[in-house]
């Protein structure tokens, strides 16, 4: 399987970069890397873990909460997102969804 570099940018501009294999959810990999991210259901059925993709592609077909218009703007549920390329994601974006 492939491994991609994922950079997360938090609300205060802090950056964390770590490797994520293409069969691991970004949230799980972030926790393993010691990065503290918001989450609730861990099943893609709420919006607590939402982020916004600045660069790159994910597979988040396991999620159910976001709709097409969210995907078109780059929003991502990190708890059900597999990386499909190197990524830059801004985290803590739940309040922007509504």
UniProtKB/Swiss-Prot annotation:
Binds 1 [2Fe-2S] cluster. Transmembrane segments: none annotated. Keywords: 2Fe-2S, Chloroplast, Electron transport, Iron, Iron-sulfur, Metal-binding, Plastid, Transport. Pfam families: Fer2 (PF00111). InterPro entries: 2Fe-2S_ferredoxin-like_sf, 2Fe-2S_ferredoxin-type, 2Fe2S_fd_BS, Beta-grasp_dom_sf, Fd_pln. One of its GO terms (biological process) is electron transport chain. [2Fe-2S] cluster binds at residues 41, 46, 49, 79. One of its GO terms (molecular function) is metal ion binding. PROSITE patterns: 2FE2S_FER_1, 2FE2S_FER_2. Residues 4-95 form the 2Fe-2S ferredoxin-type domain. It is found in: Plastid, Chloroplast. One of its GO terms (cellular component) is chloroplast. Its main location: plastid. It comes from the Eukaryota. In radish there are 4 ferredoxins: 2 are root-specific (R-B1 and R-B2), one is present in both leaves and roots (L-A), and there is a minor form which is leaf specific (L-B). This is Ferredoxin, root R-B1.
């Amino acid at each position: 399987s492939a491994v991609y570099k994922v950079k997360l940018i938090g609300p205060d501009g802090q950056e964390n970069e770590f490797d994520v294999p293409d069969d691991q959810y970004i949230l799980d990999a972030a926790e393993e890397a010691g990065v503290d991210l918001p989450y609730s259901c861990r099943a893609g059925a709420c919006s607590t873990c939402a982020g916004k993709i600045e660069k790159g592609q994910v597979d988040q077909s396991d999620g159910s909460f976001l709709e097409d218009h969210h995907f078109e703007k780059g929003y991502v549920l990190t708890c059900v997102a597999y990386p499909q390329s190197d990524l830059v994601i801004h985290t803590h974006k739940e309040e922007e969804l509504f």
